């Protein structure tokens, strides 16, 4: 199962070692799932951490060893994704769909919340706790 991580999930996983977002990284390290993020998502997470929790940049760098880097989406795909989410979030949705992720995991309820539990072009959008559930269901 491939889970695409939004910048806010990367941020939260970096600053909260016991949270749900970090649990996804641990499960990926154990081979229970694959995680992916785009340069756009990683850059946003790095900027936010540098401003708000600079001491957590090392944690993000360590976690990225378990996250596949996928390409940013073509601008045309981002334009298409803008039909579903705000323009600033369209590159995230577009990259997740372009990577053929099973799930886009995001904590952004304001912009993605109305899509939680729904699929957009084959990629289901879920908050971290719900994104974790199918991974745990696969673990023996």
Question: Predicted segments — roles?
Answer:
Residues 83-86, 90, 97, 102-103, ...:
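Acidic, PIN/NYN-like endoribonuclease modules and their adjacent C-terminal/linker elements
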Residues 39-40, 107-109:
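Short secondary-structure boundary segments
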């Amino acid at each position: 199962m491939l889970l695409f991580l939004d910048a806010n999930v990367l941020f939260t996983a970096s600053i909260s070692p016991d949270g749900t977002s970090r649990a996804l990284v641990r499960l990926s390290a154990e081979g229970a799932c694959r995680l992916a993020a785009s340069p756009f998502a990683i850059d946003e997470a790095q900027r936010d951490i540098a401003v708000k929790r600079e001491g957590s940049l090392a944690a993000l760098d360590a976690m990225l060893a378990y996250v596949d880097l996928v390409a940013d989406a073509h601008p045309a795909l981002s334009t298409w994704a803008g039909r579903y989410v705000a323009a600033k979030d369209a590159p995230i949705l577009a990259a997740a769909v372009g990577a053929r992720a099973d799930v886009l995991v995001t904590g952004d309820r304001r912009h993605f919340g109305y899509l939680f539990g729904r699929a957009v072009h084959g990629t289901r959008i879920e908050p971290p706790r719900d994104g974790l559930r199918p991974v745990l269901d696969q673990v023996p």
